[in-house]
A protein has these predicted regions:
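N-terminal subdomain of nucleotide-sugar transferases
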Residues: 1-63, 242-251, 414-421
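Nucleotide-activated donor-binding/catalytic signature segment of Leloir-type glycosyltransferases, i.e.
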Residues: 260, 265-293, 300
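Nucleotide-sugar donor phosphate/pyrophosphate-binding loop at the beta->alpha transition
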Residues: 91-94, 129-134, 142-167, 203, ...
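Membrane-proximal helix-turn-helix segments that form the acceptor-binding/catalytic region
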Residues: 97-104, 120, 124-128, 141-142, ...
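Nucleotide-sugar-dependent
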Residues: 22, 235-238, 284-294, 301-320, ...
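Carbohydrate-associated surface elements
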Residues: 180, 200
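A charged, aromatic-enriched C-terminal amphipathic alpha-helix characteristic of glycosyltransferases
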Residues: 353-355, 370-402
């Protein structure tokens, strides 16, 4: 491994998403701003596509100037979607050429690839640049698509993705989201630096005064059960509606709040199926800056994900955000490190199975937890200790960067999170 010269670290962060996507706004830019403040010069390459109307529509020039003020230089390429495999090849070629040119021109030290395709671009560019490459592993991609029903195990795309993954382990450093992923992917001691960095929350977004959401959604005096995030088969939308139907039989004041960028029809159809009246739920897209107000107005949080092998590498963003809002979390089992954290930190309830009896048991336990003195503060303490964007997320990224560069690491990271059984 070639050591980085003694000067400010320079990184090119490659992200195969649009800057305007909510995921990039909440799970990429805050980390890059933190790394910039820590002394790293940052370039960001995104792949842009046509934006849905509910995403930000501010012109590129405004965003480019804003990011430059944060110490981030923003580069863009066009995202191609069809036909699927040829489009990916075009993006990989275009991305590799752009990365090579940028790294050479700006004397960049580290190419940071977020997920498989971005890391592949970095590794293809490495022989032409001499830069070090980070593979930021966001999950077990091939297995995830098979479990979601999008791919068939053994299909061409599945086999290509598995081959690419093996190639990606030639990277110089790695990020994984969970302890379980680290144990599965790197069972032996690795000579290469690895950091476990879960999806974190930005405490600054939770420090602002929260508006009265209960009145706005017609839920004053109700027990609000909140679900934030994607909908669909992977996220057990049918089971979410079934759970709420059971909760209503126990607490007639129960009210379901769903904040999602998915089609509201997905959950509305399921609520209609169970006979839930419209007065007992609210479904809306909530921009990231307003989400804390909605979560802090709630009482109990739901995190439902279809179990499967790929989920051991998953770190749901909503989990950190729920805890930051002081909420007990009801979750399916087998999702990343959540089982161990919920059990050991006592911040929620794990569903035994997806049955009415299990739903009733979990709701009663969560309802009792939220009423315990000091429970909300205990949840917030866990959130700050284990998922703080600055003291955990950014600090661990900088630890990885310094390990790659051979620089001393002055950053103290709190490792005391109960993520093992």
């Amino acid at each position: 491994m070639t050591a980085v010269v003694e000067r400010e670290l320079r990184t090119l962060y490659v992200c195969y998403f649009s800057l305007y996507e909510p995921l990039v706004q909440t799970q990429v830019l805050p980390y890059l701003r933190g790394m910039s403040r820590a002394g790293t010069k940052v370039w960001l390459l995104t792949f842009e596509r046509t934006m849905p109307e509910h995403w930000t529509t501010e012109p590129e020039e405004i965003w480019r100037a804003r990011l430059r003020q944060d110490g981030i230089e923003w580069l863009t390429l066009r995202y191609h979607s069809r036909p699927s495999l040829p489009a990916k090849i075009v993006d990989i070629v275009n991305g590799t050429v752009r990365v090579i040119r940028t790294v050479r021109r700006e004397r960049i030290d580290i190419i940071h690839g977020r997920s498989h395709l971005a890391a592949l671009i970095g590794l293809l560019a490495r022989p032409f640049t001499g830069a070090l490459v980070i593979f930021d592993i966001r999950g077990l991609l091939a297995e995830y698509y098979v479990e979601a029903g999008n791919w068939r195990a053994g299909s061409l795309l599945y086999r290509i993705t598995k081959m690419v993954k093996n190639f990606l382990f030639r990277a110089d450093g790695f990020v994984v989201l969970t302890d379980r992923a680290r144990a599965e992917m790197f069972p032996a001691v690795s000579e290469k630096p690895i950091q476990i960095i879960p999806t974190c929350f930005d405490p600054e977004r939770w420090s602002a005064p929260q508006e009265d959401i209960r009145e706005a959604i017609g839920a004053r005096g109700r027990t609000i059960i909140v679900y934030a995030g994607s909908l669909g088969i992977t996220y057990l939308t049918k089971e979410l509606a079934d759970f709420f139907a059971v909760a209503r039989t126990i607490d007639e004041t129960a009210f379901l709040l769903v904040t999602t960028h998915s089609s509201p029809r997905l959950i509305r159809e399921q609520l209609d199926r169970t006979g839930i009246p419209a007065a007992d739920f609210h479904i809306a897209y909530v921009p990231p800056e307003k989400l804390p107000a909605y979560l802090c107005a709630s009482d109990i949080a739901m995190s439902l994900v279809k179990p499967g092998y790929s989920k051991l590498a998953m770190s749901p963003t909503k989990f950190a955000e729920y805890l930051a809002s002081g909420l007990p979390v009801i979750s399916t089992r087998g999702i990343g490190d959540m089982d161990a954290m919920i059990d050991n930190e006592r911040v929620g309830v794990l569903l035994d199975d997806l049955t009415a009896d299990s739903y009733a048991k979990a709701f009663r336990k969560a309802d009792a937890l939220r009423k315990q003195p000091g429970f909300a503060d205990a949840c917030r303490e866990v959130a700050h200790r284990c998922f703080d964007l600055h003291s955990v997320g950014t600090a661990r990224y900088m630890r990885l960067y310094r390990a790659l560069s051979g620089s001393p690491d002055p950053v103290a990271v709190d490792e005391k999170c109960a993520t093992t059984p």
